[in-house]
Each structure stands twice: as C-alpha cells, then as structure tokens.
C-alpha cells in the first residue's frame, strides 16, 4: 500500500501546485451524501486556510444540465473547477467543455489516467489499483490532497466519509492508513462500545430510532421504554455504564438472537460533534433534506448549523422508522424492491438487505430514481450493482456507482421493465 501511496503522492503534489498557482476563484462541486459533504468540508477548510477565493455547490448528480450551467460560468470567469465524489464518470463532458479542472473521485473512471490533458488532473484510486468501493472514499481522496498541505487534522472528516460510505467494517487499504494516521496525530480515539451510546439522548429514544441495528419490536418510544424498565435499566439514562451494557446486550441477544452490530468501534474525533458515527448520520440527514449549506457548516463546526443538524437528524430518524414500518417489499427471482419516499430509499434498502439485493425507487415528475444496495456477502458471490444499474442506458436513462451500492434514473413508464432486466443481470452475476 505504501508503494501505491507514493505513486498517488506524485499526483497530489501536482494538484497542490495547480491550486497554489491559480489566482482566480475556485469552483468546488461535490455530492449531497455524507461522503460528498465530508469532501466539501475538507476542501472548504483547505481552501480557506490557503486564502483561496472559492464558491462551493452541492449537487445530487453531475448531470449534463449541471455541466451546461458550469460551462456558462467557465466562459465568463474561467475558474478552477474541483469536482469531488464525481467527475470520473463524466470526464468526457468535462473535456468537451474545456474546463480547467481537478477531479477527486473514487468511482470507476472512464479514462484511467491522472493527467488527462494540460488542464485536467484526475486523482482516482482505481488508476493505482486501489478499490474505491472498499479501500478509500471520496473524502479520503480529498484528504490525501489536504495532507499535501500539511492539514492532517482534516483526517477526521475523511473518517466520517468512511463511515458514511460503509467502508469501515473492516478498514482496508488507504482507509486503514488514514485512520491510523489520525490516531498517530491524536485526532481520533477508538473505543469499543454499545451502539446506543453514540447519540447522547435518553437510551429509550436511542433504541427506538436506531436503524443499525433495526429491531422492529422496539421501534417505538413506548416499547423501548418498557423493555428497558423490564430488565432493570433506567430508560432516561443518556449513557450506559458497563453493567447496564452487559444487561442490555444479554437481554437483546436472548430475545432477538439474529440481531448483529450491537457493539461497534466508536470513533471519537477532534470535532464539535465528537462521535464520527453521529456526525455521519447528521450529514446524511441534512443532505437528504436538501440542507446542503447546513451540512458544509456542520463540517466547518458552525454552532448554529450543528444545532439545526441535530434537530433535522431526529426528525429524519423518526420519519425513517415510520417509513420502514410502511415499506412493502416485493420480490423477483433475485432482488427485492419497493417504492418509497425521496431521500430515504437508499438508507432503507441498506437496512433491509439480507439474502438478496434490495432496490428502492421513487417517482419524481416523469422519472424514477433508484437506489440499490447489497452487502459484502453478496459482492463476494459476484454481485456488482454498478454493472447491473448501468443497464439503465438500455432504457434511455443512466446508472452506476459501486459494486455494493449504486443508483439509476429511468423514465417512470420503464420501471417494471428496468427492474426485470436488473433482476436478470443480478441472477447471472450470482450464478457465476
């Protein structure tokens, strides 16, 4: 891994020089999920510290429409564009519009070169044989650039991105390197703990609105309160001590033996939101609610944004539990699917995935947007959701992402045809 890092550092050095030698303003475009917002936070802090004028925008997709708008900006202002958590899949459009650009992405690249032309540098782990779906996130890629400036403290936001993109169990490759570097500089402390201690709210609320793990029988405040009372734990405690932890673990495992992930490695970071899991959930909630500026503000440790983020998180968690209770899973040969609400289908799919991939979709105007989720067991059996969802092109849409998590967009009248085709492809993958 260190040999690969040395090769990557040749590119990060070139990116640093490109940023320092640009005297106009910088245009940052990043994604709206946790990893994208963490990436935006890293880049914002880095550019503020280097006294660079910049304008940051968060988008759901780097669509042709978004690129066309940026092209008009480019004609007038000639900024340096930095694309984070996107760009490698849209590089032909970026080249076509003659952008002066830096691409910091971890999705499979269309062009497997770092130096695309005299104007475009691409830092993508896949070019160096590093798996962007398991070994590093977009925020990790952004951190490798910030690290070139000596900003090692920004590793904490990369850790949040690792959690947001579900790359923490286990930590592999450059993810492990980033976490170890953060530990070395004392920006993170890792401790094994019960998952409910993350939230610092009354423990009955933590249990009622927890989705990892999701225990349907306890997914209401009243039921969680009674369960704790019955086993002799004060439901209003905000942190469980070792005695109460053992008591709760024993009770849950006895009653719900299939439940996993009750004990986790918590990442206590140097940030006003101390727990990286909590910060990751907060960014996901504000991102899914379209409060992108709040998300970046949380990364920048703005007190008002953190306060708003905490309120939005608990509203989101309550809505999520209600949505989970109402979801009606339908089954094809190789997938489960459901129709859900905007901003929730991805997280619901990831909660419900077990023996088959789960695909959620919602209708927005004339189009249907899909989020597909698998797990590592399915990927090890051959699942590649990025390939499966890319079949959207056959239906006049587009799709892609990672092997374990991916998305697609097609017209709403093609939903059933698309799902049937995806089911066939996934069946072929899992039979290999």
Curated annotation (Swiss-Prot):
Pfam families: DHHA1 (PF02272). GO terms for molecular function: nucleic acid binding; single-stranded DNA 5'-3' DNA exonuclease activity. Disulfide bonds: none annotated. InterPro entries: DHH_sf (IPR038763), DHHA1_dom (IPR003156), SSDNA_exonuclease_RecJ (IPR051673). GO terms for biological process: DNA recombination. It comes from the Archaea. To M.jannaschii MJ0977. This is Uncharacterized protein MJ0831. It comes from Methanocaldococcus jannaschii (strain ATCC 43067 / DSM 2661 / JAL-1 / JCM 10045 / NBRC 100440) (Methanococcus jannaschii).
């Amino acid at each position: 891994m260190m040999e690969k890092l040395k090769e990557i550092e040749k590119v990060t050095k070139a990116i640093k020089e490109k940023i320092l030698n640009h005297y106009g303003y910088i245009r940052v475009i990043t994604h709206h999920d946790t990893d994208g917002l963490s990436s935006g936070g890293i880049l914002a802090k880095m550019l503020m510290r280097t006294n660079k004028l910049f304008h940051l925008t968060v988008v759901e997709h780097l669509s042709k429409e978004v690129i066309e708008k940026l092209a008009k900006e480019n004609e007038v202002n000639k900024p340096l564009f930095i694309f984070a958590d996107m760009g490698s899949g849209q590089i032909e459009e970026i080249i076509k519009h003659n952008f002066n650009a830096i691409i910091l992405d971890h999705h499979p690249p269309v062009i497997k070169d770092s130096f695309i032309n005299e104007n475009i540098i691409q830092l993508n782990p896949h070019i160096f044989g590093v798996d962007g779906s398991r070994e590093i996130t977009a925020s990790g890629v952004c951190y490798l650039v910030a690290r070139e400036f000596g900003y090692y403290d920004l590793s904490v936001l990369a850790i949040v991105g690792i959690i947001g993109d579900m790359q923490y169990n286990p930590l592999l490759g450059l993810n492990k390197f980033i976490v170890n570097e953060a530990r070395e500089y004392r920006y993170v402390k890792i401790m094994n703990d019960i998952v409910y201690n993350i939230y610092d709210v009354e423990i009955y609320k933590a249990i009622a609105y927890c989705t990892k793990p999701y225990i349907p029988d306890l997914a209401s405040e009243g039921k969680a309160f009674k369960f704790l009372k019955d086993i002799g734990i004060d439901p209003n405690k905000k942190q469980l001590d070792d005695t109460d932890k053992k008591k709760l673990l024993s009770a849950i495992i006895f009653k719900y033996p299939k439940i996993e992930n009750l004990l986790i490695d918590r990442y206590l970071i140097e940030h006003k939101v101390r727990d990286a899991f909590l910060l990751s959930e907060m960014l996901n909630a504000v991102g899914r609610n379209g409060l992108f500026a709040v998300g970046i503000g949380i990364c920048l440790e703005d007190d008002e944004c953190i306060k708003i983020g905490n309120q939005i998180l608990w509203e989101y968690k309550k809505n999520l539990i209600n949505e989970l209770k109402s979801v009606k899973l339908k089954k094809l040969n190789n997938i489960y699917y459901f129709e859900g609400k905007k901003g929730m289908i991805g997280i619901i799919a990831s909660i419900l995935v077990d023996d088959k991939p789960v695909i959620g979709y919602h209708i927005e105007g004339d189009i249907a947007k899909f989020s597909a989720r698998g797990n590592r067991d399915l990927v090890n059996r051959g699942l590649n959701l990025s390939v499966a969802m890319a079949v959207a092109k056959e239906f006049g849409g587009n799709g892609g992402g990672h092997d374990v998590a991916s998305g697609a967009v097609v017209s709403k009248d093609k939903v059933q045809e698309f799902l049937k085709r995806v089911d066939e492809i996934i069946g072929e993958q899992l039979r290999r």
